[in-house]
Amino acid sequence: MSESLIAIVPAAGIGARASLPGEAAVPKQYRPLAGQPMLRHAVRALLADPRIVQVRVAVSAGDGWVEQALAGLPRTVWRPCGGPNRADTVAAALADSGAAADDWILVHDAARPGLPAAALARLIDACLDDAVGGLLALPVADTVKAGRQRVSRTVDRDGLWLAQTPQMFRAGLLRDALARARAAGLAVTDEASAVEAAGHAPRLVAGALRNFKVTWPDDFELMEKWL
């Protein structure tokens, strides 16, 4: 395989929803889980597959936690490329990586420390021969309701999936998709959204329950049990 596999972890946010009122303002990705920062777990999960040649962590300028959080991890670098939103952070990290157009980029949430090695391998295996690339996802199992304080309707869950990460695309395709989305003023919440907006159909690859995104305060206790 001539193309390299490079992982990008956007870690420039603060994760305010994960904090309880009055808690110290330690960014979510640096809060401890099973004795280690959550970000370290997420990066180690990516390093479990030797086909990933490097993990690049994008942090905010002046980040005072990352060096200690990731000390000693192989094939890992961190760079102050954090932007005002996820898409800008990923685009900056991609530009900083020096990746060739045909290299594969795997973007993974810092708040998904429970990524199983089998799910990561499944994604890579499925995407290496795919013309577009893809993402880990889970079919929606629960009944879905739309509404604010009251239900306005029940949404047909047939064909609905919950997007996870990593999301894996060629560097050239992803770079172009993110640039197009920005030029069009599209608010994309993940890389697949940008790729879809560029006219492509990413592949859906079975994810894992334990690969959920740590978002709310109670999620830390649940993830501790997985780790």
Swiss-Prot record:
Enzyme Commission designation: 2.7.7.60
Keyword match Transferase: yes
PROSITE patterns: ISPD
GO biological process, one term: isopentenyl diphosphate biosynthetic process, methylerythritol 4-phosphate pathway
Pathway: Isoprenoid biosynthesis; isopentenyl diphosphate biosynthesis via DXP pathway; isopentenyl diphosphate from 1-deoxy-D-xylulose 5-phosphate: step 2/6
An example Gene Ontology molecular-function term: 2-C-methyl-D-erythritol 4-phosphate cytidylyltransferase activity
Pfam families: IspD (PF01128)
Catalysed reactions, as listed in the record: 2-C-methyl-D-erythritol 4-phosphate + CTP + H(+) = 4-CDP-2-C-methyl-D-erythritol + diphosphate
CDD domains the UniProt entry points to: CDP-ME_synthetase
Site (Positions MEP for the nucleophilic attack): 157, 213
EC primary class: transferase
Residues at the site labelled Transition state stabilizer: 17, 28
Keywords recorded for this protein, A-Z: Isoprene biosynthesis, Nucleotidyltransferase, Transferase
Summary of the function given for this chain in its UniProt record: Catalyzes the formation of 4-diphosphocytidyl-2-C-methyl-D-erythritol from CTP and 2-C-methyl-D-erythritol 4-phosphate (MEP).
HAMAP family attached to this UniProt entry: IspD (MF_00108)
Family of the protein in this entry: Belongs to the IspD/TarI cytidylyltransferase family. IspD subfamily.
Name recorded for this polypeptide: 2-C-methyl-D-erythritol 4-phosphate cytidylyltransferase
Organism expressing this protein natively: Bordetella pertussis (strain Tohama I / ATCC BAA-589 / NCTC 13251)
Gene of this entry: ispD
